[in-house]
Amino acid sequence: MKKILLLHMLVFVSATLPISSVASDEVETLKCTIIADAITGNTLYETGECARRVSPCSSFKLPLAIMGFDSGILQSPKSPTWELKPEYNPSPRDRTYKQVYPALWQSDSVVWFSQQLTSRLGVDRFTEYVKKFEYGNQDVSGDSGKHNGLTQSWLMSSLTISPKEQIQFLLRFVAHKLPVSEAAYDMAYATIPQYQAAEGWAVHGKSGSGWLRDNNGKINESRPQGWFVGWAEKNGRQVVFARLEIGKEKSDIPGGSKAREDILVELPVLMGNK
């Protein structure tokens, strides 16, 4: 009886722990897709393990855009334009982006722009927005002992979210039920990248790429993860979707790019049956 009870406890803990708190070699490959009706909230399609939390990575740029426009720090898809400064300490990739405006920030996923936005928001406003949005585990503390939550919490750090929670956030966004201004909705909607899928579907969404961490907390590049989350429209019909993929081998293709291309192919097919 004790063995059975222990087994049930282990299963429960495994199901509720975020992937970032589990060693990367303890997590199998994962692929989740959820599509829900934007009006009713009803799930139209769900497959895979969709309750596990992982880092949102750059898919967090969607809520960041809403925060930026609601706070007035961002004004439109083309304004403001911020110039890169050496003290921003950008990645080698992001050093090529010398001047960035909101639409370019979103389409090209420029990390230093995100970090400058949160720095301008400040800890208190940033934390308040995440809590009001009920976004994932709402933990923006950052890496343990580093006090870097304001600029790092969503980048393979403390903030985690599951595909199911992404859907709940997206449903609130498209229904205008987040505690933000109407202008924030309009500007965020206009800034998020749009893609054309088959069968006349217009897909709006943000990808996010990263990796799991190993037992020592180091990034394990053989465990890529990729998000693509957003909404899609066709002939007055609107759905929200979340796609999460976690692999078991190193890839030259960013995980978010792969998740995006997969959903652009699959969504029209899946919705054709609904």
Swiss-Prot record:
Enzyme class: hydrolase
GO biological process: antibiotic catabolic process; response to antibiotic
Residues the entry annotates as binding substrate: 206-208
Molecular function via GO: beta-lactamase activity; penicillin binding
Iron-sulfur is among the record's keywords: no
EC annotation from Swiss-Prot or TrEMBL: 3.5.2.6
Signal peptide region: 1-24
Keyword list, A-Z: Antibiotic resistance, Hydrolase, Plasmid, Signal, Transposable element
Keyword Nucleotide-binding: no
Function summary: Oxacillin-hydrolyzing beta-lactamase. Confers resistance to beta-lactam antibiotics but at a significantly lower level than the TEM bla gene product.
Family: Belongs to the class-D beta-lactamase family.
Protein name per UniProt: Beta-lactamase OXA-9
Species the sequence originates in: Klebsiella pneumoniae
